[in-house]
């Protein structure tokens, strides 16, 4: 199955930002989203490959897809119902 990163409800451009800024921006953006909405994050900080999946697990959001093979890294998250 091919994931279409282009159908996200919102896009967060976090390129050029370094830890912890990308995850802080994700957290702030997700708080403003409706349950079930999707967020595409574009980032180039290597720590996001670890931090964003961990954030999703900890906060009960669904990491639908991630592309960490090329820059910018892309992460597609669905906001969890309990967040």
UniProtKB/Swiss-Prot annotation:
Matching Gene3D superfamilies: TusA-like domain (3.30.110.40)
Keywords annotated in UniProt: Cytoplasm
An example Gene Ontology biological process: tRNA wobble position uridine thiolation
Top-level taxon of the source organism: Bacteria
PROSITE patterns associated with the record: UPF0033
Family annotation (InterPro entries): Sulphur_carrier_TusA, TusA-like, TusA-like_sf
Protein name: Sulfur carrier protein TusA
Annotated source species: Aliivibrio salmonicida (strain LFI1238) (Vibrio salmonicida (strain LFI1238))
Lineage, opening ranks: Bacteria, Pseudomonadati, Pseudomonadota, Gammaproteobacteria, Vibrionales
């Amino acid at each position: 199955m091919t994931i279409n990163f282009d159908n996200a409800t919102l896009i967060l451009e976090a390129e050029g930002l370094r830890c912890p800024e990308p995850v802080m921006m994700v957290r702030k953006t997700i708080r403003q989203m409706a349950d079930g909405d999707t967020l595409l994050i574009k980032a180039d900080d290597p720590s996001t490959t670890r931090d964003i999946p961990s954030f999703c697990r900890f906060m009960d959001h669904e990491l639908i897809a991630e592309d960490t093979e090329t820059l910018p890294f892309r992460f597609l998250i669905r906001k969890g119902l309990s967040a």
